[in-house]
């Protein structure tokens, strides 16, 4: 199959689910990931077969004999055909509605590659913007980072999380999911102690398995229900950040099947009659764990900006780059 034929096949197979431009972009992602084919090849070499474009490193001529051994050539051919099959299989998965990030097994967030899959919410651009705001604010504060260190723990263990008021600059990510916020902040501030918690064991497994290059220590991840009281033994925090569930159940009708059928509902939705339940719980955690001069960063449903801000005296509602009320910051 040629590059052009594969792109056209993607557009055709994915047309019931995605607009043409989005389906085409997905085709390019599959070609790049599985076949090492950059998107510009669609224009410059549209008739190139996928198999011949794949694994080109195997086709370097032997420097001494100027020939490729038959066994190596056959192995390379098999590898290339396997990759073409993998690419077509990935397209089949996409055609069922499975998210591209789950098919690839990762997503990009704040310049890092995060593992994602079933049971783990896919990070969104709005959350990247939230992290960027935290980073900008902390860099603006000369006292934002002081020495500290941590070690990672497995889900379900909270007993040894002990620190006193003299602990280093600390950040807590509530409803951490994939751990994208916690890891991104740990990468940016190597001297800070970063914690992340979630109730979902599946999400915590992903959070603990991330392999983000750090100059400091790994975040500490622990199991906790944000709707319950904070576990004993946690330190005071200088920053609490959260992207909790905030989409009302009644908003499901406006969402795509690739979200509704695959991503964890418990990480997305709240009851229509209690849309602020997680924010009230976060307020209780902040009352106990946030230092008096600490900062709070929350991602919110644009419909409830003023309602969320009212739970956190001194906070303000901040719009995202699209102009929608998306954050409450204090």
Predicted features, each with a name:
Residues 28-32, 92, 132, 151, ...:
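Generic alpha-helical structural context detector
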């Amino acid at each position: 199959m040629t590059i052009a034929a594969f792109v056209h096949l993607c557009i055709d197979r994915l047309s019931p689910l995605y607009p043409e431009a989005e389906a085409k972009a997905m085709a390019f992602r599959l070609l790049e990931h599985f076949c090492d084919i950059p998107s510009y090849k669609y224009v410059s070499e549209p008739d190139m077969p996928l198999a011949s474009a794949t694994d080109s490193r195997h086709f370097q001529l032997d420097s001494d004999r100027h020939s490729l051994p038959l066994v190596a050539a056959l192995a390379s051919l098999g590898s290339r055909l396997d990759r073409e099959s993998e690419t077509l299989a990935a397209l089949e998965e996409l055609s069922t509605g499975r998210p591209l990030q789950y098919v690839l097994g990762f997503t990009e967030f704040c310049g890092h590659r995060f593992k994602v899959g079933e049971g783990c919410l896919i990070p969104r651009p709005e959350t990247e913007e939230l992290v960027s705001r935290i980073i900008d604010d902390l860099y603006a504060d000369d006292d934002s980072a002081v020495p500290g260190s941590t070690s990672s723990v497995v889900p379900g263990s909270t007993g040894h999380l002990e620190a006193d008021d003299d602990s280093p600059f600390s950040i807590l990510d509530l409803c951490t999911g994939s751990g994208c916020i916690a890891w991104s902040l740990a990468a940016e501030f190597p001297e800070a102690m970063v914690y992340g918690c979630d109730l979902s064991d599946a999400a915590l497994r992903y959070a603990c398995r991330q392999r983000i290059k750090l100059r400091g220590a790994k975040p500490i991840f622990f199991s906790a229900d944000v709707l319950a009281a904070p576990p004993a033994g946690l330190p005071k925090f200088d920053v609490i950040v959260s992207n909790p569930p905030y989409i009302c159940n009644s908003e499901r009708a406006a969402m795509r099947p690739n979200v509704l059928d695959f991503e964890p509902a418990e990480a997305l939705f709240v009851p229509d009659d209690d849309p602020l339940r997680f924010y009230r719980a976060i307020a209780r955690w902040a009352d106990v764990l946030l230092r008096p001069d600490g900062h709070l960063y929350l991602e919110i449903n644009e419909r409830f900006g003023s309602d969320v801000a009212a739970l956190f005296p001194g906070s303000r509602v901040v719009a995202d780059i699209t102009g929608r009320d998306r954050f409450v910051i204090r």
